[in-house]
């Protein structure tokens, strides 16, 4: 299986956080070019440190290992820390040409889907939005797509791994199904987040 991941960061609307502040958070997106399998995570900022953390996260979140990534030329992806992380994980990194975001069109189109299918829903807090994003991540990986000959990303992954089990990612860590949806209390607050972000895992 080709393991070329398209990665991007999308700012989310300003909403109330668990500590009561109103500010932006950032959606980190990784989509596999071949299967269209997607992984999402929300972080507090668009920084090299969070880009490095997300890169490490997707090495466990995909059922197959991501060996190549394509990013835009944002500062978080051109930072030395991110380059070193790619080298450490033996991930080949490429960036888009300057001023040509369409070069990373697959993830840009997915971001458009998020904008039209998720961000148009009225919510009052980041906690509520992250519940929607988690559910959307799960639903998208199970959605049949014409480009995949009527299969879903999840079905595509399963078939290819059945055909060649050597492609399986030994570091893959599926989430507990009970933890797929973040728990939101009556105030709209989530439980304590880890490293400033709430992950949106999908268990294929």
Regions found by a protein language model. Give the residues of each.
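Short catalytic-loop micro-motif centered on adjacent basic/acidic residues
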Residues: 41, 68-72
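RNase H-like two-metal-ion nuclease catalytic core shared by retroviral integrases
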Residues: 71-73, 77-86, 93-116, 127-134, ...
């Amino acid at each position: 299986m080709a393991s070329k991941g398209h990665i991007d960061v999308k700012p989310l609307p300003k909403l109330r956080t668990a500590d009561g502040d109103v500010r932006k958070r950032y959606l980190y997106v990784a989509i596999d070019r071949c299967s269209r399998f997607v992984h999402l995570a929300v972080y507090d900022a668009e920084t090299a440190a969070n880009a490095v953390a997300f890169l490490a996260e997707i090495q466990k979140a995909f059922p197959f290992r991501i060996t190549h990534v394509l990013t835009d030329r944002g500062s978080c992806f051109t930072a030395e820390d991110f380059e070193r992380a790619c080298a450490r994980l033996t991930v080949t990194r490429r960036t888009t040409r300057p001023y040509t975001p369409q070069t990373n069109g697959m993830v840009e189109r997915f971001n458009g889907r998020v904008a039209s299918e998720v961000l148009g829903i009225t919510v009052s807090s980041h906690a509520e939005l992250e519940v929607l994003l988690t559910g959307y991540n799960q639903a998208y990986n199970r959605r049949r797509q014409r480009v995949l000959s009527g299969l879903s990303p999840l079905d595509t992954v399963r078939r290819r791994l059945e055909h060649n089990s050597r492609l399986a990612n030994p570091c893959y860590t599926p989430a507990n199904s009970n933890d797929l949806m973040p728990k939101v209390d009556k105030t709209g607050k989530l439980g304590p987040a880890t490293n400033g972000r709430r992950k949106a895992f999908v268990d294929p």
